[in-house]
Amino acid sequence: MVLSLSPGPAPISEVEFFRKFAQMWRISDDFWDSWPSLKEQFARAAAWAPLSKPGAWPDADMLPLGKIGDPDDRGSRRWTNLTRDEQVTLMTLWSMMRSPLIFGGDLPANDAFTLSLLTNPEVLEVDQRSSGNHQAYQSASMIAWVADAPNAKDKYVALFNLSDQEQNVSVAFSELQIPVAKASMRNLWEHKDLGSADHTSAKLPAHGAALFRATVN
């Protein structure tokens, strides 16, 4: 049996209470499919992620992806208002903070893109098996997260573009407190090896994200 405390927001000062009596708890009020709502989750995720542990999970709420209902819950169905780039950002942030992944849409109505978001094994491994997850860098328009891969040597690195314009982002490993000179980079959303580097970089669309595995050489 799983006890999920909902809705939120759960006060972070009561984390020991939640860990003792529940397996998951909502970190926010109902999360819906809008960029302002998604952007607000970054600060909550950063605060809660270091406090998660097996059997006690901060919950960023269900995934409003694919064909979903409206807040009035009168049976109407529509496609999510999040752009495809924002949907990638949502899945990347939820996975990097190790939130429970609970689909909030009409599963039989999924299109190929929505299904690809939910079934990417390399991304799901981040949510299910990473550790040490935390926000490692923030500027006015960009955020980076870092986590340990299961073997404790490799790192997962996520880059997020919070701005309304496309931008090229680059962060040195030293800025992310990754103590290696170089690593072999792999883009987990694109299933593409990128070669060796001493930094993480990507051209990110507005509100977009990228997720990498850095394998220590």
PLM region spans:
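Catalytic cores of secreted or luminal carbohydrate-active enzymes
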Residues: 89-137
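Hydrophobic, well-ordered secondary-structure elements that form the walls
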Residues: 157, 185, 207
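Carbohydrate-binding surface patches
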Residues: 94-97, 102-104, 138-178
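Glycan-recognition surfaces
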Residues: 2-102
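C-terminal beta-strand-rich structural cap/linker in extracellular carbohydrate-active enzymes
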Residues: 195-217
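Solvent-exposed beta-hairpin/edge-strand motifs
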Residues: 174-190
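Flexible loop/turn segments at secondary-structure boundaries
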Residues: 10-13, 72, 103-104, 110-114, ...
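Loop/turn elements at helix/coil->beta-strand transitions in domains of secreted/extracellular proteins
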Residues: 1-2, 153
